[in-house]
Structures are given as structure tokens and as C-alpha cells.
Amino acid sequence: MKKVDVKESAVGRETRIRKQWNEQSIFEQSIQNREGAQSFVFYEGPPTANGLPHVGHALGRTIKDVVARYKTMAGYKVLRKAGWDTHGLPVELGVEKQLGISGKHEIEEYGIEPFTKKCKESVFTYEKQWREFTESIGYWVDMDDPYVTLENPYIESVWHILGTIHEKGLLYKGHRVSPYCPSCQTSLSSHEVAQGYKTVKDLSATVKFKVKDSENEYFLGWTTTPWTLPANVALAVHPNMEYVKAKQEGHVYIVAKERVQDVLKENYEVLSVHKGEELLNTSYTAPFPMKEVTNGYRVIGADFVTADSGTGLVHIAPAYGEDDYRVVQSEGLSFLHVVDEKGEYTEVVPFLKGKFVKDCDVDIVRYLAKEGLLYHKEKYEHSYPHCWRCDSPLLYYAGESWLIRTTAIKDTFLQNNDTVTWYPDHMKHGRFGKFLENMVDWNISRNRYWGTPLNVWECESCDHQFAPKSIADLRKHSTKETPEDLELHKPYVDEVQVSCEKCGSAMNRTPEVIDVWFDSGSMPFAQYHYPFENKELFEEQFPADVIAEGIDQTRGWFYSLLAVSALYTGKVPYKRVLSLGHVLDEEGQKMSKSKGNALDPVDLVGKFGADALRWALLVDSAPWNAKRFSERTVLEAKSKFVDTLVNVYSFYVLYANLDEYNPNETYDVKRTKLDEWVLSRLHSTTKKVRTALDDYQFTNAAREIAALVDEVSNWYVRRSRNRFWESGMNAEKAAAYETLHDVLVTISKLIAPFTPFVAEDIHLNLTGSSVHLEDYPVVNESLLQPKLEAEMDAVLQVVELGRSNRNQHSLKVKQPLAELVLLEHNENDMDWESYRDIVMDELNVKAFHVELDETKYTSYQLKLNFKKAGPKFGKNVNAVNGWLKQLSQDEVQNFVSTERAVYEAASGEEVVVTTEDVLVEKVAKSGFSNTTNGQYTVMLDTNVTEELLQEGVAREFIRAVQEYRKQLNLPVNLRVDVILDTEEELQQTLTNHKELLEENLLVKQFTFGHLTNEDDELSLGETKVRIKLSAAQ
């Protein structure tokens, strides 16, 4: 075995292992070795390569890698195809910035062809950084053969899906109100909108709509979007709701009966009550009368009107509200647009022409006030949608869009979701399920340039549509020869003209591109260019056994995958979804570069190593929980887990090499109870870890492994050190080597999916083979000893209590104590005699015994809990307190046992006192200190005799010299001669404990003499000792 370089950094180790993986094609071998095995399928959600990775990506890549590595080691064939999301607005916005242009007008002036070429060039800006990040974090995924959404084969598969949907009559062109981004100048789908809500404060207004031909009667309407008022064409009431006419300060106002108090507040008189249906068709004067409204400005009925807020009357602007649009269509009222595609008022509103509407709420309200039409204004906090790409506030905007009739197969969506296992499970019928319940038709078209072109050609003369499902299909119907290398992007596909099968006229492609979420949702099919090729491979890789991405993908990729698959095949595309929580900063705030609280995962790997970062992300909390995260989190993972394991491994290699131990040779071995215990712990942990990983409970699995590594380091190795330090090779020492070797090899396999680099380093050095080509450990039932584990757990509890006891009373473990008494509070069959020596050695005590009668070593003190007893006992409270103080210890003991006692007050009244009224404190016998955990109480004799004090000094001296040896980098097996120069009293103490010193310090000759200032000095408290070490002669 190679010597472990303890000075090698984690990054150095990981760089070395990566090189070895690449040179020996270990990733490729891990897949090839499972050829013919059952497939386990996972899909890689495609990131965009025009932005850099963040800590959330580190979590996602870690989880996916853990799953893929574990399933591979568990015997499955796991293909891991990378992917790139390369279309959409982020790319366009980046290119606009690069070119110094802004908006669709300037893009078209620049030229669509050069613009889309620039987009294509820019999509892989950070591909090198993504590849380096992916490899450095240890995520094994095939980046040499990824699916890329901009490539023709991928787009052709998307066209086949869209063409099939069109064939089914589910793709249609409609005029409707959709969420619209005025900055990007395109509409968005409902699932895109769901990703961008923000809590904002907007100016709201309660507006007076004067009843026509009345002097002082007004409908009151409330709106949080005053900018829409110039487009008003109607007021809506609920036909079955009650409304009142109420007089206030000379005016009569009409509002919902349920809302009158909240709206008018005070000083009003209700004149009459009317059903909403009685108000229908009442005409009013609009705040902004428009000549274009030839049929409108009257009250209509609508079921969506409620009395939950506002006035119970809804101002209707059909161009800017979905409900508004529908009700106006059904009523046959006028339609009025007052806003252009940039979100600015048109000449229809002259005094605000050219202004962005969301900036005009104050202007609108001022105008209303000036005209006497403003009843009330206030800031209103509400959730408002923003563009998930550019962060601009959205408008609801009427226009033509291409939509997929997802509502027609809503039941399929819901049924498919019912078959999926969600982590966390509440997502299934909660956030995701509710979104499906309330879904609307998918707005699939985008009035942009860089994206998959919508493959629909429309006839110039009739209503016929043609939706080619392949390039060959398009060529077959085109009126002129199409290039062999036709690129399926704008403007190239726009130049292809088709002849109408119905009337023979020319057909042109509709100019839109599609929603990028449809691109990524098509990946199960398009990644293999299905159905044009790879049919068998696709069928083997569909559906996914698991997908894992951030929770923000609930209404993104998780939805688009489900939707595309349901629309195309009717089938569900995945069996399990791991919805990962946000990685937050230390204060629980979302990380962002603008706030300056974002952590760069590349920097974290560079400082602490990928294993530490991965472990920190896994062990802290379940991956679907939001987690607070910082550099300190990663540092703790490194020091507590990775470094601890490396220390155990280096300890083993150091001593095994010194003793020339060869695990491949056969030795006579005699296992101790400690060996049997650690092997049982190893296999019981293996059992728990496999169960947890099979249920995707990564954190539970990681914590089980962490506990095992801690016990191996801080219990097994520490308790076995003397065996490793012995000279020669005997049966017990050989058993220690054999046991620790088996433990380390198995742990390296257990952690391989979690921390792949350190796992590889250990396994490769101990066995000569890659851990990632091994099978995952299975439980050896014959090595499980539950009773032994329970007994050792009890020992560990007692030792921990003893250490805590010493800490509380400032008694160093190096200071021997006379006695430890263990009080057991629950009867059990624990054989403490078998563990006597371990407990005494660990806690450095001279005697140990178990006592069932705790009254010999403890007593109870009772104090009245005045907070509870005061109200209960009233005037008797002080008398009860005095009575408690004078109880004998037997009476106190009886009270604690029975949990009640009766005090007879001076008045003769019997007062029942229970343990709920009293604070019960257990007090140790004089000269003892106690610590308890409910099951056990550890009593330590704190009287330190002179003899014990001197031994404590000797043990402290041993610790100091051992540290000194480390500083000198002396070989651990080097026997030394020691010369000491110190005061006479310490000389005598050390002489009295010469054997103890020689045994623990590998000292051959131990002498006292005069040393010069050039020699080194050790500190033992306030005492100084000069020391000189040399190799023993």
C-alpha cells in the first residue's frame, strides 16, 4: 500500500483521482460492466450554458450523481446523457446586450439572420466552465454526447410531437388574454407565470362611475390596476348578490351589501337593497369615455364577482383581463385596446401616449381626483406576476396566440400524476396537483426569434393549416426545393413555402417560435431523435425511474415533461420526482449575486474539495427542505467527516506498512468483542443505508454512515490502538488489522455514491481496484449482533456521561479519579462486568461498580414552583413551601416515588401537592458529582488524593511529549532515549511513574540531567520542562 500523504489537500487528492478516472475510463467502464443488466433511467434536466452554475446546481448534480452511482453499484445499467437548453429569451437578451441593441424593432433592423447566428454562437459561452464544474464536483454524466435543443434532430422530434398534437385537434390559434411581458414583447404560459410572482405594493383606487341620467348616483368600483381604466367597457355585478344604495355626504353610492361597511366606513345611510340582477343593463358614464366603445358602458352579470374584497362591482377591461375578455365576448360588447406591444399607451389616451402603463397609476388617479371621480386611494400589497426571465412586471394582454388544449385532457394529467411518487409527498396533491387542477390551455407561441420554430403553415386564401411532422414531410409539400442542410430556425424555415392541399394557394409559416419549456419537456423523445431512430433505445429509456431538479421546476420542467408526454403518448414520463429545496444563506435568505450573499460552488470545491461540498449538501437536511448554507457548513463537513475518515485510513496504512501486514495473506486471528461489535455496526449500518437509499432518503443514509465513521474513529480505533502499537504480530493484532481493513473497504463502498473521490482513494490503495466498478455492500447477517451493539451503545452512553461529568466539574480526563458509580434506572440484562476495564480506562478511574439503590449516592431537594403553585394554593402557598423544606429525606423519597403528598393546613384543610407543583432536583452525595440521561446516572468521586494528583501530572506529561514527537515528525514506531531537565518535585513524580511513561512514549532510556537553552521546552501547567529526544541506541 502507498503511504498516505497527510499533507495532501482535498483538492490535490481529487485532482489526482480525476486524472486516474480519465486515464482508465472508469466512468465508461462502470456503464459497460452493466451491459445486459436491467436499466435504471434518469433524465438530466438541461441547464443553459450561457450562465454560470450556482450552489443550487451543485445540490442537483450531487443528488443525481448519488442516485446514478448507487443504482450502478446495485447492479443496474444507468445511462447518463447530458443535455443543453439552448433556446429562448435569456439567450436573446444576452445577445442584445452584447450588440448594444434593445427591443424587437432594433433586432429586426440589425437583421434576424445575423441575430439568430449570434444567438447560436453565444449559447455555449460557459460550456467549458460547466464541464469543469461538473467534473470537479464528481458528477458522472456523458457530456461528450449530449442532447442539444438547437440541433436539427432534436427540433425534428419536437416537430413530430407538435404535428401529432395538431393532428389530434389540440393545437389551435386563438385570440385571448394572456400574460405578456412588455419588455420581452411576448406572451408567456401559465406555468411560466407561476414561477415569477412577487409581493408588491401598488396604488389601488375606488372609482366613481356615474349612473347615466342621474344627478348624484354612482357605482363604486375598486381596482388594483388603475392603468386599465381607460379601456373600461362595462361594470360587472353578481346577479344573485345583494347591493345597497347608500347616501353619504349628498351622494348615493351603489356597493355590495356585504362590503358597504368596509367601503363607506361611517356617516352613511342605506336607502334601499337590490339584487344584482336588478342592476343589469344600467348605463353609466365611464371615467374615460371612448368613442370606439359603441356597445358598452353598462352593468353586466358575472359569476366571478365576489364580496371578498373591493366593492362587489368589477371594472371590466376586456383587453387586459381573462375573465373580462370572456364575459365581454359572451355579452357582445365592444373591445378596446389602449396599450401597444411595448406596454405603452397609444394615441387613444392622448395625455399619456408613449408612457409605460405600470408607471401611470399615479397619473390616472390624479386625473380621477381632478374630475371628482376618485372615492378613495391607498397602497395595496398583493402578489403580482413578473417575467421569470427579465424580472419585468407582466401585463394581461389580449392578442392572438397558438395554444395547446391541455384542458381537454386534464383527466389524463391528473391520472398520470397519481401514479408518480413525489419527494416530498405533499407536492403530489399540493403545489403540483393544485396547479394541474387549475391549469389553463398552454400558450405555446412566442413572438420572438431564437427558438424552435412553430411548425404550422397557414393558407393565404382559406383556413387550412399544415403541420409537418418531419423535415421530409416539409420537403414533400414545399413549392420549391429545400436545401439538404436546411437549418430549422428563423429565418431559414420562414423562407420555405408550401402549397395548400385544399385550394392550391401559397401557405406561409406562422412567424412564432415555441415556448422553451416545450423544448425541454420533449427531451425523453427528442434526446434520441425519436421516432426517426433509436426506437429500441427510447423504449428502454422511457419512462424515467427518477428525475431530480429544484422546486422551482414544479411549474417548469416537471410540468412540461408531464404535459408533453400526456399530449403525445398519453403516458407518464417519470415514476418519481425529487423536488429539491432552495439553498439559502446563513440568515435564511435566498442567495443572489446582487445581494452579495451568493456562494460560488467552484470556489467551494477549490477551497474544501468536492467531497466536502457534496457531504455538506447531503447530511445537513433532506434535499427537498430549504437549507441554510455557508462556507462554515462545508468546512464542518470536511473536518467532521472527510478528514476523520482520512485519519482512520492513514492510521491503518501507517501501521499496516510498519508491520508489513498483507490483507491477501492468511493469519491466525482472534477477534475481540470490540472487533465483533464494529463488524456488527458495519453491517447493521449497511442494512439501514441500503434501505434509506432505496427510498431516496439520502440524508438518513448519510447520517448513518457519519455515525459509523465517528464510532470507528473515536471508539474502535482508539480502543484498539494498543493492539496496533504492540511489537510483532499476534492473533489479536492480526484480527485488528483484518477487521479495520474490512471496515475501511466496506465504508469506501458505502460512501462511493456520496463522496466519490475519497472513497476511490481509500479503495484503490487498499485493494488495487476502483470502488466505482464494485457492487454496493450487502449485509452479512451472520455478523449482526444486536445484543452486542445494544451493550456497546450503553457503554458509550456511560462514557459520554462520564466525560460530560468531568467537563462540568473541570476534571481533565488525564487526571485519574478513585471511583465511578453507575446508577441504573431501568432493569436490564446488561453484563457490566464484561465492560468494566473499558469504562475504567476510558474515564481514567481506579474502581467501577453498578448500584441499583440510588439513595446510597443521591438525595432529592424539593423547591416549590411558585409560578404554578401560587395560583393553585393561594393563601397556603408560603405554608406549603415551609412544609416542603422540613420534610425528611425518607418523606422526600416517598413523595418522588408516589408523585404526590398531602399537607394539612392550619385551618384543617387538606392540600394535595404533586410533582407538577414542585421542582425536583437530584443532588449527589458529598464528594461525588453526577450526570444523568434518564437511563443512567454516572457518579464520580471527585476527591483527588496526592497519589492520584501525581499520576495525573505524569499522564499530562505523556500528552505533551506525544505532541512534541509529532512536531519533530518522528516515526511512530521509533523508540527514543529521553533526557529531562526539571525541578525536583516533578522529577520525583515522573520517576514514580517511569513504567507508565516508557510504555506510552516508546522510551528505552529515561534520565534526568542539565540541558541548555538551546534545547526545547515543554509546559505542564505553570511548570517548565526542558527535553531532549534522540533515537534509542
Swiss-Prot record:
Protein name in the entry: Isoleucine--tRNA ligase 2
Alphabetical list of HAMAP family matching this protein: Ile_tRNA_synth_type2 (MF_02003)
CDD domains the record matches: Anticodon_Ia_Ile_ABEc (cd07961), IleRS_core (cd00818)
Organism superkingdom: Bacteria
Gene Ontology CC: cytoplasm
Taxon lineage: Bacteria, Bacillati, Bacillota, Bacilli, Bacillales
Pfam families recorded: Anticodon_1, DUF5915, tRNA-synt_1
Sequence positions that bind ATP: K593
